[in-house]
Curated annotation (Swiss-Prot):
It comes from the Eukaryota. It is linked to Persistent Muellerian duct syndrome 2: A form of male pseudohermaphroditism characterized by a failure of Muellerian duct regression in otherwise normal males. Residues 203-518 form the Protein kinase domain. Residues 171-573 are cytoplasmic. This is Anti-Muellerian hormone type-2 receptor. It comes from Homo sapiens. The lineage of its organism: Eukaryota, Metazoa, Chordata, Craniata, Vertebrata. Its EC number is 2.7.11.30. The active site is at D333. Belongs to the protein kinase superfamily. TKL Ser/Thr protein kinase family. TGFB receptor subfamily. Disulfide bonds join C55-C79, C92-C109. Glycans are attached at N66, N119. InterPro entries: Anti-muellerian_hrmn_rcpt_II, Kinase-like_dom_sf, Prot_kinase_dom, Snake_toxin-like_sf, TGFB_receptor. GO terms for molecular function: anti-Mullerian hormone receptor activity; ATP binding; hormone binding; metal ion binding; protein homodimerization activity; transforming growth factor beta receptor activity; transforming growth factor beta receptor activity, type II. Residues 18-149 are extracellular.
């Protein structure tokens, strides 16, 4: 049985953690990717290893050991990016985790006392994953006093919290006895939406077309035109203001980004009143719904793929136009539910609820975008199925997080391109593609867990299956396969940019043209194809009564069978 590593003896005795900051042992073995150095402040303790680090974003330490042939080696030690389950432990109790190398097992621990990640007393046998580790080191007499003080402090804190709750209930009761309205909690915001936003009497609600965690999307009409209304409850005003701020950025107008019309307040009833985003409505619904219901020939599939890449390239681009600065933006929640189909069959990217403004190189001096608070906010992402491997295993490059988030979007884009091409009959010898499946649905089913996705996409490095018949149709036999593989590469730095993706797709759309390849794009990227000028037929204008009354059209639910909140199709009655 392994004994203690004895790392405590290597720590300088002069390091003392301030009472409000956690101090941990810091060490990273040579060759380890994804440094956690930015999660804390390295203390100047000389050149000896390991060093000490003072945590910036949590009060939790971690340690990772590699057990090979009954011999343990330290892989990483440092601060966690947030307080996670297990951080309440006073000692380092390692638990096993699979290792990609045969004959090796990783052991990890989280703990919440100073330098607690420096040592462990016992590692569980590698052949019994899930076996809890043995108890940590016995507490010294001084530690017993410290633990008693901690328990006393927690008791006093609980008592104070209980008193605050009782006081709030008494105040609420007094308001009711005196007949005064109970004051509602006001969200912490620089702008009071209830005062700033005006109601639109001509806005009417028809039918719910999608429900999310922070908002409900309605089909409706504004001044005789069909619109989508994203209604937020008052408790989600922070999400409303974040998404509104992005839509109101100068220069964000693009054919393949859902068009923002206005912000308002109201609802289908007085009791449901809250902040609203009024957006362009696309009656054909989401990409998921469309692919479930229809197949698309080679030209239509390339049209959807190219327009999707153009929209993402525009979001990612930092540019000046007509004296206005548009920053680069990472979407962070690309999925076939958040991409809509326009009347001309092209795509429009929607749902900027998790989108993030990226640091730029040419931004004006007065430009002060809201920066994310800590690594946890940077690595926040949307639909798990479309999350890049570096987000699943939390190894995103925090040194250059702007570029890292762009690369994570490219991975999601590759999965959407695969979904589009999987419904193209021209890529099948019998012209009969199989029923639509989401990315990884064939491998993991409808509701994969994060652990299942991590094992498949990170540990095994598997990707959705590309049929060999795709090579038989395209003018460039390996073009489709190379495009997808260059977008969902396990190495984020090896992935294409969104601009290069649209140039590759343009070459597939117009193979007869001569395309010079710029040197800046890996494996060559042809220039952009000309903009498509296909006109969009105007939607039918239907009569509408004032706000909170039903509109004279109905929404036919067109289920995307893989999602409980499907996209919908509008149809006049």
């Amino acid at each position: 049985m392994l004994g203690s590593l004895g790392l405590w003896a290597l720590l300088p005795t002069a390091v003392e953690a301030p009472p409000n900051r956690r101090t941990c042992v810091f060490f990273e073995a040579p060759g380890v990717r994804g440094s956690t150095k930015t999660l804390g402040e390295l203390l100047d303790t000389g050149t000896e290893l390991p060093r000490a680090i003072r945590c910036l974003y949590s009060r939790c330490c971690f340690g990772i050991w590699n057990l090979t042939q009954d011999r343990a080696q330290v892989e990483m030690q440092g601060c966690r990016d947030s307080d996670e389950p297990g951080c309440e432990s006073l000692h380092c109790d390692p638990s096993p985790r699979a290792h990609p190398s045969p004959g090796s097992t990783l052991f990890t621990c989280s703990c919440g006392t100073d330098f607690c990640n420096a040592n462990y007393s016992h590692l569980p046998p590698p052949g019994s994953p899930g076996t809890p580790g043995s108890q940590g080191p016995q507490a010294a007499p001084g530690e017993s006093i410290w633990m008693a003080l901690v328990l006393l402090g927690l008791f006093l804190l609980l008592l104070l919290l209980l008193g605050s709750i009782i006081l709030a209930l008494l105040q609420r009761k007094n308001y009711r006895v005196r007949g005064e309205p109970v004051p509602e909690p006001r969200p912490d915001s620089g702008r009071d939406w209830s005062v700033e936003l005006q109601e639109l009497p001509e806005l009417c609600f028809s039918q719910v077309i999608r429900e999310g965690g922070h908002a409900v999307v309605w089909a409706g009409q504004l001044q005789g035109k069909l619109v989508a209304i994203k209604a937020f409850p008052p408790r989600s005003v922070a999400q409303f203001q974040a998404e509104r701020a992005l839509y109101e950025l100068p220069g964000l107008q693009h054919d393949h980004i859902v068009r923002f019309i206005t912000a308002s307040r109201g609802g289908p009833g007085r009791l449901l009143s809250g902040p609203l985003l009024v957006l362009e409505l696309h009656p054909k619904g989401s990409l998921c719904h469309y692919l479930t219901q229809y197949t698309s020939d080679w030209g239509s599939s390339l049209r959807m793929a190219l327009s999707l890449a153009q929209g993402l390239a525009f979001l990612h681009e930092e540019r000046w136009q007509n004296g206005q600065y548009k920053p680069g933006i990472a979407h962070r929640d690309l999925s076939s539910q958040n991409v809509l189909i326009r009347e001309d069959g092209s795509c429009a990217i929607g749902d900027l609820g998790l989108a993030l403004v990226l640091p730029g190189l040419t931004q004006p001096p007065a430009w002060t975008p809201t920066q994310p608070q800590g690594p946890a906010a940077i690595m926040e992402a949307g639909t798990q199925r479309y999350m890049a491997p570096e987000l699943l295993d939390k190894t995103l490059d925090l040194q250059d997080w702007g570029m890292a988030l762009r690369r994570a979007d490219i991975y999601s884009l590759a999965l959407l391109l695969w979904e589009i091409l999987s419904r193209c009959p021209d890529l099948r010898p019998d012209s009969s593609p199989p029923p639509f499946q989401l990315a990884y649905e064939a491998e993991l089913g409808n509701t994969p867990t994060s652990d299942e996705l991590w094992a498949l996409a990170v540990q095994e490095r598997r990707r959705p299956y590309i049929p060999s018949t795709w090579r038989c149709f395209a003018t460039d036999p390996d073009g489709l396969r190379e495009l997808l593989e260059d977008c969902w590469d396990a190495d984020p730095e090896a992935r294409l940019t969104a601009e290069c993706v649209q140039q590759r797709l343009a070459a597939l759309a117009h193979p007869q043209e001569s395309h010079p390849f710029p040197e800046s794009c890996p494996r060559g990227c042809p220039p952009l194809c000309p903009e498509d000028c296909t006109s969009i037929p105007a939607p039918t204008i239907l009569p509408c009564r004032p706000q909170r009354s039903a509109c004279h059209f109905s929404v036919q639910q067109g289920p995307c069978s893989r999602n409980p909140q499907p996209a919908c199709t509008l149809s006049p009655v």
